[in-house]
Amino acid sequence: MAPPVKGKRKQSEEGEPLDPPVSPQPDGEPRSRSPVRLEEPPEAGREREEEQEEEQAFLVSLYKFMKERHTPIERVPHLGFKQINLWKIYKAVEKLGAYELVTGRRLWKNVYDELGGSPGSTSAATCTRRHYERLVLPYVRHLKGEDDKPLPPSKPRKQYKMAKEPRGDDGATERPKKVKEEKRVDQLMPAKTKTDAPDPARLPSQETPRDGMEQRGPAAGPSLPFLGASGCPEAYKRLLSSFYCRGTHGIMSPLAKKKLLAQVSKAEALQCQEEGCRHGAGGEPQAPPAAPPLESPQSPGGPAEDSRHRLTPLEGRQAPGGGLWGETQAGPRPSAPVVTGCFHAYPSEVLKPISQRPRDLFPSLKDRVLLGPPAKEEGLPAKEPPLVWGGDAGRPSAFHKGSSRKGSLYPKPKACWVSPMTKVPAESPVPLPTFPSSPGLGHKRSLAEDSSVHGSKKLRAVSPFLKEANAQECGTKPRGPDLAVSCLLGPALPEAYRGTLLRCPLNFAGTLGPLKGQATLPFSPLVIPAFPAHLLATTAPSPMTAGLMHLPPASFDSALCHRLCPASSPWHVPPATAYTAPHFSFHLNTKL
């Protein structure tokens, strides 16, 4: 152990002279540099001391001035995650050329970089400028002997935003602009009132030909208020367009646009009120008389029929026929007055326009047996006061085109267009056309079918549904004394009158259910003969005409559920009758 120690000492002793030549180089450098370092600190220290003294004096005077100004600096804000050094920001701005130059050249981001803020900040320049303006700028202007003048515009790059002005000039700059805008609106408003003033006077003369072309009726009165009301939006659009054209504002800020629109809307509201008063004075007195002309031609029965429009749902459905008859008298007319004047909609029913004239031709029918409405209407009141039906038999209705006579007395599900049937050639043995019908309607028979079975021998053993129809419709549905169901409408008919009951749907309301969603087919003139009113009236002493229903030539909605076949015998004139009584053969369960 000892020898190696001695050896190490020897090596260290021998190595001692070798160390100095190696060590002087690193030692010499610090020795040569040390005098420089020792010389610099006094100068840097003096500068630092001077800067610190100047900074302290600046901060003391700054705080004192701001306190005297009644805007004391209570807390120095942070900028870029660092507290702002007011001395540094002051020196940086002075180095770049004072506040006005930095603002004009947009160098506030450079000031922020010198303060050592984070480089990724997007609002660095704006925040730096605001802090400088609030904390340092008043004192800097005090040092330079400048007055505390208002600040320059905050965002000179975006000058189109007129509403946002510097804080000091907000009130002073916006007031003249508002005055100018109000002057423009005032200049435009008299012009618009001058141009719009003669409009109410022109409306009756100019717009009546248009209404005459469109309506051809007495409905020109109510159109005036609508035209007057629509005049205001047009004037508003014209005013806005002319305002923007004459204003020449260029690009406007949203706030300025809102202010402009508010001013224009106020002025236009006043104008619209004035125009409304004028239109109300000119057009509204004409509107109330226009309502009676719309209802008067549509209700030929007079006040008695108008009062019946609102008695019961059943009677309400019977009312529209009168209105439809009146519609053809006054000429074509818009659909809105017709709907509001006549039709009464019920939630569970289909709107059914009808013709009511058979009551006029056969007054004895109201004392006879009437077939009632379908089963779903059993709960409805069944009172039927005597009707006052107006009109003559020669006037067609809107729904029965070309027919010289109205249809049945009872409600039908739909209205369909029917070709004329009044004039049937006496020598026409042409077979009847066949109509397609859905197989699902086979078991839905009307009472006309059953009554025709009782009246004619050919139909007795044909249909397999006769017992079912008799049991359901004839035997099990009593509806009261006035609406008693009967399969035979009178005594047994002589042979000459059997053809008169052919396929006549005596209970049209019975077919409401199956025919609600289906289209109806028009009849050919050869299907059912239309007996003139005077011929049937001449046979009134006979028991048959008192119990017969009038054969309606109009649209038979029960046509879809009937199976019609060609006629088996031509028309002939029996010796005992004064009019033709056709005989038809029907095969009821034939599927077409």
Curated annotation (Swiss-Prot):
Gene3D superfamilies: ARID DNA-binding domain (1.10.150.60). One of its GO terms (cellular component) is nucleus. It is found in: Nucleus. GO terms for biological process: innate immune response; positive regulation of 3'-UTR-mediated mRNA stabilization; regulation of transcription by RNA polymerase II. GO terms for molecular function: mRNA 3'-UTR AU-rich region binding; transcription cis-regulatory region binding. There is a cross-link at residues 82, 91 (Glycyl lysine isopeptide (Lys-Gly) (interchain with G-Cter in ubiquitin)). The modification Phosphoserine is found at residues 23, 253, 438, 463. Keywords: Activator, DNA-binding, Immunity, Innate immunity, Isopeptide bond, Nucleus, Phosphoprotein, Repressor, RNA-binding, Transcription, Transcription regulation, Ubl conjugation. The keyword RNA-binding applies. PROSITE patterns: ARID. This is AT-rich interactive domain-containing protein 5A. It comes from Bos taurus. The gene is ARID5A.
